[in-house]
């Protein structure tokens, strides 16, 4: 029995995707990692990296909404949830919302590398601000893995990207230099 027949929905990873950046590699301090099928993801070597939370979020979303064609990912970070889900939902379009400059930049590069520019609208901003989404935008599927620890509920990293991915902070109320309570 072939592997493809044994595991329903599994597809053998293919060649490097035809994205506009598929000829480039990671910058200094970054890695380019396999994420789903033939998709690759740019990540900082010592920054926030995709995790099983992202894999499970994408899996649950696409399992319970397998016909989604227009989806939203809130607190999207480096784009891992949306890219895993987009691989499982060929043809779906995605709006992602992320507050951090660095994470948005990595997500945009990953989308371009994977040839997803036409399927992804990567927005930078706070998803709690109504203006980030259009008044009449509708989505079949909404995923999210926003920060879930209040400040003081765990060890706070020295890395700014990691702090904002794990703790409920913003730039409005200080917790640590440059970071504030939500």
In which residue ranges do the predicted regions lie?
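N-terminal auxiliary segments of SAM/dcSAM-dependent transferases
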Residues: 1-29
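Class I SAM-dependent transferase core
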Residues: 21-65
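Conserved SAM/SAH cofactor-binding pocket of Class I
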Residues: 59-158
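Mobile active-site "lid"/loop adjacent to the S-adenosyl-L-methionine
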Residues: 146-178
């Amino acid at each position: 029995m072939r592997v493809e027949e044994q595991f329903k929905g599994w597809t053998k990873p293919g060649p490097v995707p035809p994205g506009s950046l598929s000829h480039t590699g990671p910058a200094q301090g970054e890695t380019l990692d396999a994420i789903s099928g033939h998709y690759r993801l740019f990540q900082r070597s010592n920054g926030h990296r995709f995790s099983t939370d992202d894999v499970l979020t994408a899996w649950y979303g696409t399992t319970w909404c397998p016909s989604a064609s227009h989806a939203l990912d809130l607190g999207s970070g480096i784009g891992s949830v949306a890219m895993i889900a987009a691989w499982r939902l060929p043809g779906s379009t995605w709006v992602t919302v992320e507050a951090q400059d660095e994470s948005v930049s990595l997500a945009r590069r990953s989308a371009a590398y994977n040839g997803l520019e036409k399927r992804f609208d990567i927005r930078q901003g706070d998803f709690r601000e109504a203006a980030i989404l259009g008044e009449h935008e509708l989505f079949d599927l909404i995923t999210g893995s926003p920060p879930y620890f209040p400040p003081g509920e765990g060890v706070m990293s020295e890395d700014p990207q990691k702090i904002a991915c794990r703790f409920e902070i913003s730039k409005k109320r200080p917790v640590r230099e440059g970071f504030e309570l939500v």
